């Protein structure tokens, strides 16, 4: 990765992360915290935006297909905003490529394994921290 690409990802990721922080907090304060609505809104909106950007790139090319657009918007901004958007785009691309089984596996396995990984990490720390001495 070039220095220019790294800077684009860095700046985009910074902006995306700040956007996620503010939108998620705003939604949580407005709707309530009984469900993670802030994260939900960020994930769905990020998935919509990355799908829109990918569609524009596929139909219009030009600026939507440039390295700058890809690294700043797709990887940096949307990656900082929500990584679920990348996961969703990859799943849709598998479907569009006729790889429905791989898409389904990606969706189910990612969701299941990520939840299990969080539980394992959390449980592991709880267990280690309870260790005497």
Curated annotation (Swiss-Prot):
Q: Which residues bind Na(+)?
A: 79, 82
| Any Gene Ontology biological process | cellular detoxification of fluoride
Q: Which UniProt keywords apply?
A: Cell inner membrane, Cell membrane, Ion channel, Ion transport, Membrane, Metal-binding, Sodium, Transmembrane, Transmembrane helix, Transport
What domain of life is recorded for the organism? Bacteria
What is catalysed by this protein? fluoride(in) = fluoride(out)
Stretches that traverse the bilayer:
7-27, 37-57, 60-80, 107-127
Which InterPro entries does the record match to this protein?
FluC
Per the record, membrane topology reads: Multi-pass membrane protein
Instruction: Recount the known activity regulation.
Output: Na(+) is not transported, but it plays an essential structural role and its presence is essential for fluoride channel function.
Principal location: membrane
Sorted alphabetically, which Pfam families does this protein's record hold? Answer: CRCB
GO cellular component terms, semicolon-separated: plasma membrane
Similarity comment: Belongs to the fluoride channel Fluc/FEX (TC 1.A.43) family.
Q: What does this protein do?
A: Fluoride-specific ion channel. Important for reducing fluoride concentration in the cell, thus reducing its toxicity.
Q: Which HAMAP family match?
A: FluC (MF_00454)
Q: What is this protein called?
A: Fluoride-specific ion channel FluC 3
């Amino acid at each position: 990765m070039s220095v220019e690409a790294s800077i684009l990802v860095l700046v985009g990721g910074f902006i995306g992360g700040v956007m996620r922080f503010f939108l998620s907090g705003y939604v949580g304060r407005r709707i309530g915290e009984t469900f993670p609505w802030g994260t939900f809104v960020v994930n769905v909106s990020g998935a919509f935006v990355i799908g829109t950007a990918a569609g524009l790139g596929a139909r219009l090319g030009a600026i939507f297909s440039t390295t700058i657009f890809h690294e700043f918007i797709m990887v940096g901004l949307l990656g900082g905003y929500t990584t679920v958007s990348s996961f969703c785009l990859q799943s849709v691309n598998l479907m569009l490529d006729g790889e429905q089984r791989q898409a389904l596996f990606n969706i189910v396995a990612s969701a299941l394994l990520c939840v299990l990984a969080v539980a394992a990490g959390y449980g592991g720390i709880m267990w280690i921290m309870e260790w005497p001495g």
